[in-house]
């Protein structure tokens, strides 16, 4: 069958070709297959385009026609519209044409007012947009700064040992985010604040934290707090601020004494433990004391004679080794005992050492010191006895560039040696190699050596000790805070120093965690204490708001850049984030009284804090929460103002169980009942708007329930819209006094009222003229009244200076027409 079809097609083609050849006046056109295909595609595309356009027009007509629009007339109506008559230049008028002149002046005034309003609107929109962008950018900056826990390259340290910040972590709801160490510290903070708030004698926060550390069964942490306790046991120097106090010579000398005492006591304990661990080798005996302890320790430390030791022995032990280790244990009297026994071998050293022992700050007089330094340079510097050299360098505070690594082979020994050589007097005659100041030593440890030298990932507590013992408290805390496992210890050390007024705080809240400030002496750094505390509490604020509140209490006297209390600010953010309004701020009872919350413990002026939290909630758009908080703070103006904003969008909605409208309605009714029973009232305009909105809710409830007569009675009593031509002017004048919350519902109110009139009209028409014995005349009168009321609504809608939503006017007119 296919063969027959092709054969027939071939026959027709040949016939067509023969007919074409017979017409001699037509030229022959020869095309190959590709040209024929292209021509066919062009014809097909033209046909498809025309068909698709017609199809689109048909679809548009169907769509718009279903909405009652005639597409054939739309283009004609659009072409007939012209904006030229509105904004075209006014025609010139003759000088004697008063009517034309007045018309032009009126039009000019209207156009000027419109243009001015347009410009002002655009300027205000730009300003609001710019302010919003600045606020948002500031929040982003704060979040970025809060994630940078340290300055410089340390903030971008992504080594394997660095642990992930907890800032992004969130604990499981209902569970505490605090681990056992953090909880132990939190209990001590609670106990401390209890004493402070109750007005009792302020306890020592260092003591409380030390007790918590002892229960943790971690020697590193226990030693840390022993060191903190030792270093903070200094008399506070009276000064106008912490910086002057910390930089005073008396305070620095006090820190130095405490650091030396800590290192000496630690070494003595180490010596004692070494001896008791090797009793057989140590051969401990004799009168208990440092001298015999050192002798036993030397049996372990120097089991065999060391070549090069000078000036003989005392009871078989090297003289200078005995002196050094007695000094290292902090017992100068034991060292004096050794010197006295070997005085014939030591020459004038006995007198120098005796003066050193009995001096106030372990400092020789300038004459004796110069004499000792001269002897050191001439005879001792080249000595083969390392113990002799180090003792001379300590007593004479000379040759500070020599680290004496043969003797001081541990970090603690090096620290003790250098701190023993630090001087505070301004010595003009001293050479640089004989002078070491505390700022120089601090710089050497923190900047020259730094973290890499001390292998901080393996021994973080050692580096903290190095910085803390050299009075670099802020740098030590910032370092420890960067490590996840030691962060809580750093925070509580900072709290302890803060309470003792020994902490140097940053002046700006946006500063880095550790910062330098212009004009500060060398070696001084500031800690952003507020940021440190806020970063720490962020982890457990959602799950443990009570504990976070305890920490925020330390900020009660701190101010932000706007002079606002940081305690207020942090509490407000805590309440908003945790949503624990009742637990933190208290709860409003049915009788209007307030049940105290956690905040009541810390301040009597709870109203200020609650108002602040409410203000923050309002600024964040949390109007419902803000209204409840203002109610808690006894601020009826703000309560009703925000309730009006909440009610306005839902007034005309159909009520449903557990809906947003139902919840807000119940809240508003409870407020209204309580305020009426207690005689509470707000500002007159806010008050009237609130109760009018409640009446409108009643109106729409009846309307949606189909109770048109009850709804009509409500709207008639409200006198919000005119129901007669005589009251139109009065209602239009009264409309100007209504708030925006009422105006926004005007379209729905008018439509609902017109629907009620139309429903009554249809019911009247459907009842018949003689139903229930109603006379014809009465029915006509009722008809006339309903039409008059509908006409009054139309007139009112056209006269009010308010642009109603959508096609309100068209729908009103449509229903009014159906009633005629």
UniProtKB/Swiss-Prot annotation:
Belongs to the nucleoporin interacting component (NIC) family. GO terms for biological process: mRNA transport; nuclear pore complex assembly; protein transport. GO terms for molecular function: structural constituent of nuclear pore. Its main location: nucleus. The keyword Nucleotide-binding does not apply. It holds the Pfam family Nic96. It is a peripheral membrane protein. The gene is nup93. It is found in: Nucleus membrane; Nucleus, Nuclear pore complex. InterPro entries: Nucleoporin_int_Nup93/Nic96 (IPR007231). This is Nuclear pore complex protein Nup93. Plays a role in the nuclear pore complex (NPC) assembly and/or maintenance. It comes from the Eukaryota. Keywords: Membrane, mRNA transport, Nuclear pore complex, Nucleus, Phosphoprotein, Protein transport, Translocation, Transport. GO terms for cellular component: nuclear membrane; nuclear periphery; nuclear pore.
């Amino acid at each position: 069958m296919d063969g027959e079809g092709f054969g027939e097609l071939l026959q027709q083609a040949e016939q067509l070709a023969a007919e074409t050849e017979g017409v001699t006046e037509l030229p022959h056109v020869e095309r190959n297959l590709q040209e024929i295909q292209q021509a066919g595609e062009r014809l097909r595309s033209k046909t498809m385009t025309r068909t698709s356009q017609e199809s689109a027009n048909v679809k548009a007509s169907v769509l718009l026609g279903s909405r009652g629009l005639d597409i054939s007339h739309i283009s004609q109506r659009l072409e007939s519209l012209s904006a030229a008559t509105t904004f075209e230049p006014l025609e010139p008028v003759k000088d004697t044409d008063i009517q034309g002149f007045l018309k032009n002046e009126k039009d000019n005034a209207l156009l000027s007012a419109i243009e001015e309003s347009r410009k002002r609107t655009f300027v205000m929109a730009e300003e609001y947009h710019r302010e919003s962008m600045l606020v948002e950018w500031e929040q982003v900056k704060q979040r970025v700064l809060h994630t940078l826990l340290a300055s410089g390259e340390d903030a971008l340290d992504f080594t394997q040992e660095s642990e992930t910040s907890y800032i992004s972590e969130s604990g499981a709801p209902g569970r505490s985010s605090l681990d056992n160490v953090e909880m132990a510290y939190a209990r001590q903070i609670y106990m401390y604040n209890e004493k402070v708030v109750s007005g009792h004698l302020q306890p020592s926060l260092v003591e409380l934290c030390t007790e918590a550390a002892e229960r943790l069964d971690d020697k590193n942490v226990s030693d840390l707090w022993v060191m903190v306790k030792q270093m903070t046991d200094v008399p506070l120097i009276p000064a106008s601020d912490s910086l002057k106090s910390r930089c005073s010579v008396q305070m620095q000398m006090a820190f130095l004494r405490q650091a030396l005492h800590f290192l000496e006591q630690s070494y003595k304990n180490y010596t004692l433990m070494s001896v008791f661990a090797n009793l057989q080798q140590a051969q401990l005996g004799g009168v208990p004391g440092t001298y015999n302890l050192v002798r036993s320790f030397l049996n372990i430390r120097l089991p065999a004679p060391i070549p090069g030791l000078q000036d003989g022995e005392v009871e078989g032990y090297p003289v200078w080794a005995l002196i050094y280790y007695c000094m290292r244990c902090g017992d100068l009297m034991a060292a004096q005992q050794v010197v006295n026994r070997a005085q014939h071998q030591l020459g004038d050293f006995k007198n120098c050492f005796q003066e050193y022992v009995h001096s106030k700050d372990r400092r020789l007089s300038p004459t004796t010191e110069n004499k000792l330094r001269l002897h050191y340079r001439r005879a001792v510097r080249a000595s083969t006895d390392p113990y002799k050299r180090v003792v001379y360098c300590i007593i004479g505070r000379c040759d500070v560039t020599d680290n004496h690594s043969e003797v001081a082979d541990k970090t603690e020994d090096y620290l003790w040696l250098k701190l023993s050589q630090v001087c505070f007097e301004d010595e003009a005659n001293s050479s640089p190699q004989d002078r070491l100041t505390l700022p120089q030593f601090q710089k050497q440890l923190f900047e020259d050596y730094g973290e890499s030298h001390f292998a901080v990932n393996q021994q973080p507590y050692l580096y903290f000790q190095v910085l803390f013992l050299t009075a670099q408290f802020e740098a030590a805390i910032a370092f420890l805070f960067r490590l996840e496992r030691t962060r809580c210890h750093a925070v509580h050390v900072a709290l302890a120093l803060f309470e003792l007024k020994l902490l140097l705080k940053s002046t700006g809240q946006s500063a880095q965690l550790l910062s330098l400030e212009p004009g500060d002496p060398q070696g001084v750094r500031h800690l952003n204490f507020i940021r440190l505390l806020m970063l720490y509490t962020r982890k457990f604020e959602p799950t443990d708001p009570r504990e976070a509140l305890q920490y925020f209490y330390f900020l009660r006297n701190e101010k932000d850049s706007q002079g606002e209390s940081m305690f207020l600010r942090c509490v407000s953010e805590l309440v908003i984030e945790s949503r624990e309004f009742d637990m933190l701020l208290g709860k409003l009872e049915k009788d209007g009284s307030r049940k105290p919350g956690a905040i009541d413990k810390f301040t009597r002026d709870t109203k200020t804090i609650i108002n602040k939290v409410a203000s923050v909630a309002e600024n964040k758009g949390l109007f419902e929460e803000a209204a409840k908080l203002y109610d808690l703070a006894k601020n009826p103006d703000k309560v009703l103002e925000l309730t009006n904003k909440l009610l306005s969008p839902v007034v005309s909605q159909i009520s449903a169980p557990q809906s947003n409208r139902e919840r807000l309605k119940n809240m508003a009714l409870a407020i209204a009942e309580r305020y009426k029973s207690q005689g509470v009232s707000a500002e007159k305009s806010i008050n009237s708007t609130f109760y009018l909105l409640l009446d409108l809710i009643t109106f729409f409830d009846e309307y949606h329930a189909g109770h048109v007569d009850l709804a009509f009675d409500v709207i008639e009593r409200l006198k919000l819209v005119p129901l007669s031509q005589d009251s139109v002017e009065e209602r239009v004048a009264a409309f100007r006094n209504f708030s925006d919350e009422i105006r926004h519902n005007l379209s729905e109110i008018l439509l609902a009222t017109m629907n009620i009139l139309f429903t009554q009209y249809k019911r009247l028409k459907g009842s018949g003229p003689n139903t229930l014995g109603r006379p014809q005349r009465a029915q006509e009168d009722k008809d006339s009244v309903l039409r008059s009321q509908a006409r009054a609504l139309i007139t009112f809608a056209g006269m009010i200076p308010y642009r109603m939503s959508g096609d309100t006017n068209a729908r009103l007119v449509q229903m009014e027409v159906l009633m005629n």
